[in-house]
């Protein structure tokens, strides 16, 4: 059954809605309203009556069965013991998809697993889908849908985020806002009683608003199916996975956290590799890669050019490129074009060192030439902040030149410096140009793009 109703519901019921700040039923109502959801919202609470949130008055229905119209999605926020009955009513009502926020099921052990299985059977009886239980909700920015108790102001963009951990997922939403990473969707999967990562991958594969997918997982329900689906999706869009529970202690923690069987870590690594999935080991690394993979075009060749104003960061970037197996373009005849943008003591050998005297004009000319050259396939622009050029001015130059070139090549930026450098990085990221405060991070993100692109080329025809 399609997941269309999960991401584009025409109406949403919040079962366990509340007008009391601090309650999850209040936070979900507030987020739906504040994020601009345009469908109908129906609060449901056994107490009935009327509630007012953000100046909007709502009639409260005592049961989902009392709602006169069709309900596409019902978000359940009642204590675990009431969930089976509420879900039965959702089925009778013809609700299509039910995110169950409530916890106290499979993660508690055998008894909880039995109840969870009953929920799945109820859902199947009515042809209904369940997300969760034990989740924080779902966001889909193209539909202005924020049915979570996480941050309200999620930035729209091309990255879909799937998280098995609730608290971490909410924290990651906050991180993306701070780091200027735009999201198409955020989905909390929790115990994955029904809808799992593979189902979501199938949806995002054909979702035109999603260019890359990032998953935090502790384990998979059906390893074979996940790998088969991931392999198909990877031929079209990149998937980055943070797989936790790598150690024995970590695996035990995962089991008590979301009821996941973590499985052998080596098996996961091998399976990811086969399926074209990029495995990240830290949150920072995953988002660094996601920036590049969700915003940049695929490289049309192996030649990378590094443009810098400082020998130091140029050398560090070169080391990182060598470690990652990237090929630095070394045709000196062609690299000579950069001599026009540097003093006589500069170096046009790759890395191209414009020297500490580099101003806006130097960078503008060098970036323009690199973007226009048919044999230069990817570009890393590095800048050590000096008094000669305000980093924000450099950001404007990069944005302008990249846009005017038609964004046909991958381009990453690293700016090392103070507060102005941070502002410049934010400007670039807001404009879909991956920018970082360290050269190695920029190079590794570019490398992730190459790894996926090469895997895809190898498997495309098979």
From Swiss-Prot:
EC number in record: 6.2.1.13
Compartment(s) of residence: Cytoplasm
Gene Ontology MF annotations: acetate-CoA ligase (ADP-forming) activity; ATP binding
Any one GO CC term of the record: cytoplasm
Summary of activators and inhibitors of this protein: Activity is dependent on magnesium.
Protein name: Acetate--CoA ligase [ADP-forming] I subunit alpha
pH dependence text: Optimum pH is 9.0 (at 80 degrees Celsius). Optimum pH is 7.0 (at 55 degrees Celsius).
Keyword Cytoplasm set for record: yes
Temperature remarks: Optimum temperature is above 90 degrees Celsius.
Native source organism of the sequence: Pyrococcus furiosus (strain ATCC 43587 / DSM 3638 / JCM 8422 / Vc1)
């Amino acid at each position: 059954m399609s997941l269309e109703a999960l991401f584009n519901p025409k109406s949403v019921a919040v079962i366990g809605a509340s007008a009391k700040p601090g309650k999850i039923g209040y936070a979900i109502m507030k987020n739906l309203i504040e994020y601009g959801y345009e469908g109908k919202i129906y609060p449901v609470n056994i107490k009935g009556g009327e509630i007012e949130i953000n100046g909007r008055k709502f009639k409260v229905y005592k049961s989902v069965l009392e709602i006169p119209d069709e309900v596409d999605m019902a978000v359940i926020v009642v204590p675990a013991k009431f969930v089976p009955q509420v879900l039965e009513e959702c089925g009778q009502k013809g609700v299509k998809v039910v995110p169950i926020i409530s916890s106290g099921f499979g993660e508690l052990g055998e008894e909880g697993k039995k109840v969870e299985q009953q929920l799945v059977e109820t859902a199947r009886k009515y042809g209904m889908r369940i997300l969760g239980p034990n989740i924080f909700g779902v966001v889909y920015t193209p539909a202005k849908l924020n049915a979570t108790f996480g941050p309200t102001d999620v930035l729209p963009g091309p990255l879909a985020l799937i998280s098995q951990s609730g608290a971490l997922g909410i924290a990651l939403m906050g991180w993306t806002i701070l780091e200027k990473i735009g999201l198409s969707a955020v989905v909390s999967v929790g115990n994955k009683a029904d809808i799992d990562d593979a189902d979501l991958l199938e949806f995002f594969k054909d979702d035109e608003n999603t260019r890359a997918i990032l998953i935090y997982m502790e384990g998979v329900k059906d390893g074979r199916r996940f790998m088969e689906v991931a392999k198909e999706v990877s031929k079209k869009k990149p998937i980055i996975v943070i797989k936790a529970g790598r150690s024995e202690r970590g695996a035990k923690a995962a089991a008590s956290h979301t009821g996941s069987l973590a499985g052998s870590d080596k098996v996961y690594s091998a399976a990811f590799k086969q399926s074209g999935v990029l495995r990240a080991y830290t949150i920072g690394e995953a988002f660094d890669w996601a920036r590049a993979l969700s915003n940049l075009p695929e490289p049309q060749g192996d030649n990378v050019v590094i443009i810098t104003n400082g020998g130091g960061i140029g050398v560090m970037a070169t080391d990182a490129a060598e470690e990652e197996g990237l090929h630095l373009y070394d045709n000196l005849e062609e690299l000579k074009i950069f001599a026009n943008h540097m003093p006589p003591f500069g170096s046009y050998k790759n890395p191209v060192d414009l020297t500490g005297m580099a101003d806006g004009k130097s960078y503008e000319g060098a970036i323009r030439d690199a973007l226009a050259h048919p044999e230069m396939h990817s570009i890393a622009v590095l800048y050590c902040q000096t008094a000669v050029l305000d980093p924000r001015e450099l950001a404007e130059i990069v944005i302008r030149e990249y846009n005017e070139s038609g964004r046909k090549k991958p381009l990453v930026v690293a700016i090392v410096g103070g507060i102005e450098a941070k502002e410049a990085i934010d400007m670039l990221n807001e404009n879909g140009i991956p920018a970082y405060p360290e050269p190695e991070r920029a190079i590794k993100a570019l490398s992730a793009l190459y790894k996926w692109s090469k895997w895809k080329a190898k498997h495309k025809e098979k």
